[in-house]
A protein has these predicted regions:
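Signal-transducing coiled-coil/dimerization helices and immediately adjacent hinge/linker segments
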Residues: 199-262, 315-329
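Conserved adenine-nucleotide phosphate-binding loops and their immediately adjacent elements
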Residues: 47-58, 313-325
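An active-site-proximal beta-strand-loop segment
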Residues: 148-150
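C-terminal, active-site-flanking charged/polar segments
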Residues: 62, 230, 246, 285-288
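PAS-family sensory/regulatory modules and their coupling/dimerization elements
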Residues: 144-145, 154-159, 261-315
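A charged amphipathic helix-loop-strand protein-protein interaction module that recurs
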Residues: 66-72, 112-141, 194, 245-285
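Intrinsically disordered, low-complexity terminal regulatory regions
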Residues: 1-123, 130-140, 153, 162-165, ...
Length: 329
């Protein structure tokens, strides 16, 4: 990589808008996007979330963080002596975890390469995190390939992490350090970690679906006269009794049968939201410990069944030791 030629191409681009023919197409495209976003090359640091905002981001990315932590900790042991840091972001480019060499982590604070920093291209220009998010594929950005001059003191390699079922871009795993740490192996390591995380996420989802199905089967035995539909925390249909899908489609227009919007809705808001869309139904929220597993939508079979008394409702609930929170409406 000819750092001097890249620096000269960057200077010509930011000074006169000359097409950067001597740089990689991924970098040239990102520079142009950064210019379109009106990013100043003199920007000193990325914006940073407040503590409350960072808390919400971490809560929203709980599945990602939980599955990432073991893989990140193993990789961080390697990077601890390599003057590099390992970074996890959410799907919006907010840094939610940092591990690795302590000095490198401390140096990262100068440009807000830290927990809460936002590294999308529209916030801080070309960088491995933001460009991987924009392109949806792994990318390595070295030194003068960064759009903002102060960030050119870094070399970074990032790989996106996708949800194994609906392929939503969940976040990015990034390896960053000073330019002297540049290695093509950094990108390979980032890709490997991202792949391992996707496997772990898939296993976690299967486990959650299994626990949701255990609850579904219990309700199916107790409410034999009702039709039941099980949906996971992202609004995906996991299982349904024979007539439940027909009733579900009858209640909703074709466009409304996509419940994926629920993934971004606070869990305790689900019953109210779903009751407005589907009359004469109830929603049972299913949690186990701190895991929000999903919900069971209960459709009456034939005439509407009478609302159970408080005593009967308690009998219908699972034991607190197995399901710590349910909400029947």
């Amino acid at each position: 990589m000819n750092e001097r030629a890249i620096r000269q191409a960057w200077e010509r681009f930011v000074d006169g808008g000359d097409e950067p023919l001597s740089v990689r197409s991924a970098v040239a495209g990102s520079w142009q996007r950064s210019k379109n976003f009106k990013i100043s090359v003199e920007s000193q640091a990325a914006p940073v979330l407040s503590e409350a905002e960072l808390y919400r981001c971490r809560a929203d990315s709980a599945l990602l963080s939980a599955t990432a932590r073991p893989a990140m900790q193993r990789a961080a042991e390697i990077l601890d002596d390599a003057s590099s840091m390992l970074i996890l972001t959410d799907g919006a480019g907010h840094i939610i975890e940092t591990l690795g060499d302590r000095r490198t982590i401390e140096d990262g604070r100068e440009v807000h390469l830290q927990d809460g920093g936002c590294w999308r291209e529209d916030k801080i220009g070309t960088n491995a995190i933001g460009t991987a998010l924009a392109a949806g594929k792994p990318v390595q950005i070295h030194a003068s390939e960064h759009f903002c001059e102060r960030v050119q003191k870094w070399t970074c390699a990032a790989a996106p992490i996708f949800h194994p079922i609906d392929h939503e871009l969940l976040g990015v795993i990034d390896i960053s350090g000073p330019p002297t740490t540049f290695s093509s192996q950094s990108l390979a390591l980032a890709v490997s970690i991202a792949g391992n995380m996707e496997v772990l996420i898939s296993q976690t989802i299967k486990n959650q679906h299994d626990r949701l199905m255990n609850f579904f089967r219990e309700k199916q035995r107790r409410w034999a006269s009702h039709d039941l539909l099980a949906i996971d925390r992202r609004g995906g249909i996991v299982h349904a009794s024979p007539d439940a899908l027909r009733k579900f489609s009858k209640h909703l227009s074709q466009s409304d049968t996509d419940l994926s919007y629920l993934r971004n809705l606070p869990f305790d808001h689900w019953p109210d939201d779903l009751s407005k869309r589907m009359v004469n139904m109830r929603t049972v929220l299913v949690t186990e410990g701190e895991d929000e597993l999903g919900a069971i939508i209960v459709f009456p079979s034939g005439q509407k069944a009478p609302e159970p008394t408080a005593q009967k409702r308690r009998r219908h609930l699972p034991e607190a030791s197995s399901i710590e929170h349910t909400n029947i409406r």
